[in-house]
């Protein structure tokens, strides 16, 4: 493999969204990411991942589930003791016991989740919409009475009645909830319908909205971007898309798509994405695929003669952005598909 230097990359032709404010990231690697089958971070690994997320400038870290038990609460306290710049949030069910557990850790921010689809309410809990409305209002009041900031997540919103979600969202805004999370719990959204549907929601209930997308159909990043185009200002992500079933929207993909496709400011240190990905990959005991978008070892490697010829003339011919932006480097490989340009360049490099 050989490296070549990076010239300036031209901007893509995509029309920019007119906004000076950077989209906010709530990273849930330590909560939803750890819920991936077979993943169980040690306390030391959780602390290291939290520190790495804080170092790159993530705005909010969903660091765990206080109600899970003493060990989880102890780790949350340890993370808080590092005095991070990021807001540390505990994930809670709409349950007074969960609120109490979060408060006992010293958390000042709690995220309460409530199912909003009839499928979840009836099949999982044996409840109805009236119960959900009352339950979440009571728990919001409990948390705010304790001096906590509260966000609320609508579980399985993609299969819920939009009118019910809209009405409940309006009520929660009036109660002072800081942000509302719309969860595509089993990844059923598509980007076109997501843009239309979520746009109507933002217009009906203005204020901060967060998209929490799952990747069951491989559309988590696309749906997250569509939500931002529709007016959502927060995105829920995990490193490498680690999460339940097929996972979540990867922070590295979402950040670079916001920057290069939507032309929005991204105030994260993206140059640390490669090292962050390796850290989480090791902690999760899951190999980092060579072709993983944005951070894989091979995503800036070129062997085809036609491609190498173009890269040597101008790297933007076959790359969407400078590899250095994510802590990567360009590499040219000599192999079956190499052309004269590759061989000539290799000979020049080695004298």
UniProtKB/Swiss-Prot annotation:
PROSITE patterns (UniProt xref): AIPM_HOMOCIT_SYNTH_1, AIPM_HOMOCIT_SYNTH_2, PYR_CT
Entry EC number(s): 2.3.3.14
Keyword annotations of the record: Nitrogen fixation, Transferase
Keyword Transferase: yes
Gene Ontology molecular function terms on file: homocitrate synthase activity
Any single Pfam family the record assigns to this protein: HMGL-like
EC supergroup of this enzyme: transferase
Domain Pyruvate carboxyltransferase: 23-272
InterPro entries linked: AIPM/Hcit_synth_CS, Aldolase_TIM, LeuA/HCS_post-cat, NifV/FrbC, PYR_CT
Catalysed reaction, written as an equation: acetyl-CoA + 2-oxoglutarate + H2O = (2R)-homocitrate + CoA + H(+)
GO biological process: biosynthetic process; carboxylic acid metabolic process; nitrogen fixation
Family: Belongs to the alpha-IPM synthase/homocitrate synthase family.
NCBIfam families xref list: nifV_homocitr
Task of the protein: This protein is a Fe-Mo-cofactor biosynthetic component.
Protein's recorded name: Homocitrate synthase
Species of provenance: Frankia alni
């Amino acid at each position: 493999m050989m490296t070549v230097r990076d010239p300036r990359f031209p901007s893509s032709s995509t029309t920019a969204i007119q906004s000076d404010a950077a989209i906010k990231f709530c990273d849930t690697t330590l909560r939803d990411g750890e819920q991936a089958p077979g993943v169980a971070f040690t306390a030391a690994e959780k602390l290291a991942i939290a520190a790495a997320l804080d170092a790159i400038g993530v705005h909010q870290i969903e660091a765990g589930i206080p109600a899970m038990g003493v060990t989880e609460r102890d780790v949350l306290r340890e993370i808080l003791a590092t005095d991070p710049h990021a807001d540390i949030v505990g994930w809670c069910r709409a349950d007074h016991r969960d609120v109490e557990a979060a408060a006992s850790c010293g958390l000042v921010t709690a995220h309460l989740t409530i199912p909003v689809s009839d499928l979840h309410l009836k099949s999982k809990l044996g409840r109805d919409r009236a119960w959900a409305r009352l339950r979440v209002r009571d728990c919001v009041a409990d948390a705010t009475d304790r001096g906590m900031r509260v966000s609320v997540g609508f579980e399985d919103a993609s299969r819920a009645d939009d009118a019910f979600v809209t009405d409940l969202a309006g009520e929660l805004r009036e109660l002072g909830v800081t942000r509302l999370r719309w969860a595509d719990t089993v990844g059923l959204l598509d980007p076109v319908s997501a843009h239309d549907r979520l746009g109507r929601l933002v217009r009906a209930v203005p204020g901060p909205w967060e998209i929490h997308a799952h990747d069951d159909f491989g559309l988590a990043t696309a749906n997250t971007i569509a939500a931002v185009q529709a007016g959502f200002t927060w995105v829920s992500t995990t490193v490498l898309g680690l999460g339940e079933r097929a996972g979540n929207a990867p922070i590295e993909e979402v950040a670079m798509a916001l920057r290069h496709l939507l032309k929005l400011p991204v105030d994260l240190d993206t140059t640390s994405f490669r090292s962050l990905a390796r850290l989480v990959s090791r902690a999760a005991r899951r190999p980092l695929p060579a072709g993983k978008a944005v951070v894989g070892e091979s995503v800036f490697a070129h062997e085809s003669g036609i491609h190498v010829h173009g890269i040597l003339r101008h790297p933007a011919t076959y790359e969407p952005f400078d590899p250095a932006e994510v802590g990567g480097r360009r590499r040219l490989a000599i192999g079956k598909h190499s052309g004269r340009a590759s061989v000539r360049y290799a000979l020049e490099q080695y004298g």
